[in-house]
């Protein structure tokens, strides 16, 4: 018999302790991983509802199970809000992740062995953009473009040259570690020149796009995907969008998600997506995203003032790469040193990195999470100075301890969930 007062703390104290420790870590550590954020209590509430009990294979009005009349409403809300948010005429809210959304696009538009052109992982792309360790590089003929070593920006001339030479069936625009603004229109021009689909993965900038402070790829791309966390600050999940008004492609995309790549959708997560999309339609969300960019720019500028090398010389979005080659510090060691001071980052390869991806020569730094907990430009600059203090001599444990104390004070002033 199930009772409403059942809880994890009494039944599984070992698991409960781990959950409590992670909750404490999030409150007492400053989060600078660009792909992480804090979702609202409303999003968390949706994921903990009885919707998790319901199997709903298929799509609203076309389910393979009975009893779906209420979850149909949930999914339709998520779909309509996603369309409104991004100016789309098609939305599939069922992908469990961004990678699964991307896999569905490949399955819908390509045949195995077809040529795709995407950004190299080493230059800021994503695993699913053609990396040899991913399905995108194993099942398809992947050609990779990069950035201009001098400017740190995408080399559109190289993209066009590679497209003309290799005649890809699909060109991928998007990134996981790129601080510039992508010219979606230029990518579409190149795609049209060689008769390719343009597929945009805007996972990292979807929140900025929704707020209208980063160019919307929807008018240019055949298909757009995103995660629903990161800058969107929703639950972990994926989303596929389009505005080309091609019902044949829409059907192929739906079939590629279900039954092509997934079975039953996670209705409790789809409910959380619906909540997050509604939150993103609120004017306050635009204010938040504007501050995200202000904070990222302030941090990049401060690192440069302290003598550190920022790839491309700054940022125009929510993230930037810190190149530590000239400091003779590995990304792995920098990550660990900052972690000891309760500052969470992730090691990241920089362009033409001489070190392995398991060590790296850089850090990827993002501002969505710190902005979500209330940090402004002043706090962002102060935080950057603390980080530089640690990185100036990562062996100085006294500095790490001092910074840790300052971090704890700042976190107490700006709780994640106040």
From Swiss-Prot:
Site (Plays an important role in substrate specificity): 229
Residues with PTM N6-(pyridoxal phosphate)lysine: 230
Compartments reported by the entry: Cytoplasm
Pfam families assigned: SHMT (PF00464)
UniProt-listed GO biological process terms: glycine biosynthetic process from serine; tetrahydrofolate interconversion
Single Gene Ontology MF annotation: glycine hydroxymethyltransferase activity
Cited SUPFAM superfamilies: PLP-dependent transferases (SSF53383)
EC number of the protein: 2.1.2.1
Keyword Amino-acid biosynthesis: yes
Amino-acid biosynthesis found in the keyword field: yes
Record key words, sorted: Amino-acid biosynthesis, Cytoplasm, One-carbon metabolism, Pyridoxal phosphate, Transferase
InterPro entries membership: PyrdxlP-dep_Trfase, PyrdxlP-dep_Trfase_major, PyrdxlP-dep_Trfase_small, Ser_HO-MeTrfase, Ser_HO-MeTrfase-like, Ser_HO-MeTrfase_PLP_BS, SHMT-like_dom
Cofactor(s) in the UniProt record: pyridoxal 5'-phosphate
Entry binding sites for (6S)-5,6,7,8-tetrahydrofolate: 121, 125-127, 356-358
Reactions catalysed according to its record: (6R)-5,10-methylene-5,6,7,8-tetrahydrofolate + glycine + H2O = (6S)-5,6,7,8-tetrahydrofolate + L-serine
Enzyme superclass (EC): transferase
Main location: cytoplasm
Top-level taxon: Bacteria
GO CC entries: cytosol
PANTHER family with a match to the protein in the record: SERINE HYDROXYMETHYLTRANSFERASE
Family the entry assigns: Belongs to the SHMT family.
NCBIfam families: PRK00011.1 (NF000586)
Assembly and interaction partners: Homodimer.
Function field: Catalyzes the reversible interconversion of serine and glycine with tetrahydrofolate (THF) serving as the one-carbon carrier. This reaction serves as the major source of one-carbon groups required for the biosynthesis of purines, thymidylate, methionine, and other important biomolecules. Also exhibits THF-independent aldolase activity toward beta-hydroxyamino acids, producing glycine and aldehydes, via a retro-aldol mechanism.
Name of protein: Serine hydroxymethyltransferase
Species this protein is from: Shewanella pealeana (strain ATCC 700345 / ANG-SQ1)
Lineage: Bacteria, Pseudomonadati, Pseudomonadota, Gammaproteobacteria, Alteromonadales
